[in-house]
């Protein structure tokens, strides 16, 4: 597997990042402010010092958190030091976030949808539930699938679907870790496959839409019905299947590769494989919720996630792939060029079909269990 390192300086933030070792390594960010953040490999912050002449202040509410609380606090502390804004993140899956934003449209309680696949952001943009903002990231990225042309959402990371396998469970059932979609139909995996519900999870919908691109819609549903015979359970969250496989509860979990790699980082014995026919990918997006009560802070947060400092940190601690040009990958991260992607797969195009496909999945598969 090959990895690459590229060095690039973003106009908004200059970063000098040394490799993390056993002792704290300084991360220095300079703009019109001075700041020192000391970070260890375990991502512990010892000191944050920063002064900004024009703090925004107030509160910022994020929906869908992406990272565990300790890692979020590193980011929130830095952002607060720069902007004087207290950040709160309410953890939820993409399905719950969509439902909540729609239910609150007359009196929004959140400011930013932070993460989840761009499928969710496209759906919200189609309903005019997000505010246009062409900030740092939007202007940085090329036209195409990575951003909305009107600025209603912008992609800030990539992720690819993979298979998480438990060596212990595989040995018990006498099977190998699957290397293709077709492998998942083998009766040897009966009751041993875990995947999220496409009705609740953007991860699972990315899987479903990828199969529809690869096989055709009707054929994808026929495939899923056959795979359903081997599925032990459908989870609500997209990262749960990888966690369950890593814990040895099931042989195979279908999740994003970065979530599986986080289990490997914990020292858990889990194998990561990719389907040889090709896999689908997500563009994780960010958008400002229409009617945000602190739009200035929301815009500052959107700009912040496109800083090289954030992009590098996000890849280092979460293995999600940066969209900012020149940000090299952390050791162990799987790049887009390292896997076979489904030819012609466009997550933005499939986002427009989400409601119809999810309804069909529920009728033909979900309600039949």
Give a label for each model feature.
Residues 74-88:
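Short alpha-helix C-terminal cap/hinge motif
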Residues 21-24:
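Bacterial signal peptide processing site
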Residues 61-73, 88, 92-96, 108-249:
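Extracytoplasmic ligand-binding site segments that recognize negatively charged/polar headgroups
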Residues 119-123, 246, 250-269, 318:
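A ligand-binding cleft/hinge motif common to bilobed small-molecule-binding domains
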Residues 164-169, 209, 282-294, 313-314:
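A bilobed periplasmic-binding-protein/Venus flytrap-type ligand-binding module shared by bacterial periplasmic
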Residues 140-143, 159, 188-196, 223-228, 234-235, 304-328, ...:
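Periplasmic-binding protein-like
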Residues 17-19:
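C-terminal motif of bacterial Sec signal peptides marking the signal peptidase cleavage site
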